[in-house]
Amino acid sequence: MTSRPSSPLTPRLPLKSLTLAVGLSLGVTLPPASAAEVAAENTPHRYTIGAGPLHQVLAQFAVAAGVPLSFDPALLGNRQSPGLDGNYSVQQGFQQLLQGSGFDLVSSGGSGYTLAPHVEANGALELGATNINGQSAQDAEVYAGGQVARSARLGMLGTQSVKDVPFSVTSFTAQTIRDQQAQTVGDVLLNDASVRQSAGFGNFSQVFMIRGLPLNGDDISYNGLYGVLPRQIIATEALERVELFKGPNAFVNGVTPSGSGIGGGVNLQPKRAEDTPTRSVTLDAGGSGRTGGHIDLGQRFGEDNRFGARVNLLQREGDTGIDDEDQRSTLATLGLDYRGERLRLSADFGYQKQVINQGRPVVYLGAGLSKVPHAPSARDNYAQDWSYSQLEDTFGMARAEYDFSDNWTGYVAGGAKYTRENGVYSSLTLTDLAGNGRGGMLYSPHDEENKSLMAGLNGHLQTGPVSHQLNFGLAGMWGEQRSAYETIATSARYFNNLYDVVPRPRPVATSFGSDIHDPRIVGKNQIKSTAVADTLGFLDDRVLLTLGVRRQSIVVDGWNTVTGARNASYEESVTTPVYGLVIKPWEHVTFYANRIEGLAKGPTPPTSAVNRDATFAPVRSKQVEAGVRLDMDTYGASLGVYRIEQPSSYTGSDNVFRVDGEQINKGVELNLYGEPLDGLRLLGGATVMKTELDGTLNGSNDGNRAVGVPSFQLNLGADWDIPGIEGAVLSARMLRTGGQYVNAGNTLSLPTWNRFDLGSRYRFKLDEKAITLRANLENVANTAYWASANGGYLTQGTPRTLKVSATVDF
């Protein structure tokens, strides 16, 4: 990609001679090469250099080649290199090592050379020395347009180039978050055609359907660590990356805390202080008067900018686009880091609070309905004014990495969180097509404490012509859940209508579980795993074979909320393998395939289910996937096919949660991202899914489609720079989702729905300050539709919502 320097270029010199000097310390260079060395630089020689940090690999190669290079290693940040193995001339070797880094070799004005970002001028490649700032380094790590990153953190495998792994991975950047004014992780994930958003069991949590299978907010990792993030809704203001891993990922990341994530996982990367100070203030407004402010401050300190601090503060409150719904969001985070020559440390601390008053709930369907009632008006709210949800989380984690040598790096990380939730919920269960139904009441405080640890060792070695990337990992999480509830009997439920809601007084509770003011322990879980993997490289790493195995153990104890009696206790362990293959036959084309298995904690019934205290045994899943990627430097695309098998679970019309039979999801996915034409950025894709139930009770539902899985999903998104108006951009996006069934018997279904979004932004300077104005309009047509039937209940799509903001970067 093209990266523009932040300071004027020195006179440009074509890249001809590579008589270079190596000196990784600032101001330190080695003597220039002799004439004999210069003459020999184009002669290929055999080099075997292990993988490691790019600046170290460059130094080793230059010393081995007998040529000097002078540059500041901080310019390359934490970029990694797979090393070099084979016959190369000096020029070929440096080109191979710097490929995709965003940097090239340039003359420093004498006989020496340095590094500079890739610059394209008049169609010919000419390079000039420049000072590199933090933004330039970031630009080299993303596709043109800045929406999607080239690498992602893959748990025990560490940070990997997306094109070199046998899995389907997409990493969305902070720029995408800002430009789309995405306020939650769900807003970001909607950019991928394999993902749709549902709602939790009446408490306004976000549930993500990835490849037709749910991922709960509990099961999103933070910098590779599970169990330390807010469990229901996650704000985006402190995030640098939202990384989506499609398919079972227990091998890579370990077992998820709540047992979801078979269809895919999400890892969030926190913001870090950049070499250039960050001073950003954003004011925003949206919905029906909801306003907010966000402050983002970052600074590096000390020798070589080794110490960094990043602070993000957010407050947003007011009415949403749904009638009478009010939401307040508070976020405060602090990220600290240290980057030494061999030691890297980081610590992240956060506090988040979400309060939703009279939030629009999900809708249940009673027995006897012949079809699904149509969705109410997009802005209609069928919640009672006494319903609310309050979600409060305090969380933190620390991580350390140390390079024992150029080829071996160890890491250890630990974190914890405390969650306090309160809420009074009320959802309608419809009994006829006219929208009549009965509403309940559930008051359910919930406390949760988690502690999480992980450690590992990543290394590289060579055995003859075969390279090895070795990974050893340990992971563990310890959780404790406390809950209580007050509710009413079925006979005491109030009558109401979905299309003509009548305010009702809050019913008096008639059924109780535990002490509302001091909830008792209802669950404890221990999740531990050990994993080892080896990625073998053949033919100069043009063929990569990943072999791995993970030993997973789950210990779960459960207690009845009413009596306190133990009602579940089990311990189960399983060893699951992973096989992955990457073939790179041509420069821009990669083929990949994988077979991966996983073990997950048994599904948890919703609090609204009759058997809310039931505990289910762990479930085992497996996936087979194959695909091809196209990487054209400025843009990329991928096409893949997959098959996932896992036990099926759902809530029936009798309000009983069941695990029944096996669900098989088969799909074809297409993804497109980057900037194929100058000034035009694309972010979209399509997926077609076929699901099937097998082995159900008495075979009653065998061959039916699984609940809540659309037949297809289509995303078309584009960003366009307006010609003649520098800094002005228009954007548009279409979301189209195919029909899906609401019940396992396939007698009730939802129709296909469409949503159209528009956006614009304008960036300019005023008094040397960068100002960005943004406006995004979601659901332009204000279409009313049922967005999801996941779990056997209905989630309505958001109404037309206008978001505007102004950001000042000092």
Protein language model annotation of sequence segments:
Residues 539-540, 636, 643-645, 659-744, ...:
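Gram-negative outer-membrane beta-barrel transporters
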Residues 470, 593, 624, 707-810:
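Conserved C-terminal beta-signal and adjacent last beta-strands/turns
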Residues 316-320, 333-403, 416-448, 492-519, ...:
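Acidic/polar loop-and-plug regions of large Gram-negative outer-membrane beta-barrel proteins
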Residues 355-369, 478-482, 578, 582-625, ...:
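Surface-exposed extracellular loop regions of Gram-negative outer-membrane beta-barrel proteins
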Residues 399-415, 419-425, 592, 617-675, ...:
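Membrane-embedded beta-barrel scaffold of Gram-negative outer-membrane proteins
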Residues 237-240, 249-332, 338-344, 394, ...:
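Outer-membrane beta-barrel translocator/receptor signature
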Residues 337, 448, 467-471, 475-479, ...:
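Structural signature of Gram-negative outer-membrane beta-barrels, strongest in the C-terminal barrel
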Residues 63, 68, 83-85, 128-276, ...:
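Acidic, small-polar-rich N-terminal luminal/periplasmic segments of exported/outer-membrane proteins
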